Amino acid sequence: YMDLFNDEIVSFHIGQTPSAAGIQEALEEAIRITADCPYRRTFHSDQGWAYQMKAYTNRLKEERIFQSMSGKGNCLDNSVMENFFGLLEQEIYYGCVYHSYEELKAAIEEYIVYYNERRIKKSLGWMSPAEYRRKHAAA
């Protein structure tokens, strides 16, 4: 999950295969992290099977979180996450060889920490997502 205020990755799950349990785990973490949000929360996703499960949609309703979904086959509706995945692939995947699932998973986890804490963005005034969040929390 990404916070569109500062493009920070708030929660995620990495698994060898897609699973409902992994999606629910990331959802619960995103709910916990955003619980004190002063404005209405909107969780946006593509139309993948996991985001249409009753357990998922009911959990959003319980928390009064608005569910937004991309139009069918329209990657532009989810362009912010598509951009993040493009950066991730470009910066840690292409040209690299990972010898195990664990090695790839560790690289992705390290990249997310780097992306949130150190990777500056022009749109955030040349700050990292975490720096931008901290600056505006103090204001």
Where are these regions (language model features)?
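Charged DNA-binding/catalytic regions of mobile-element recombinases
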Residues: 1-139
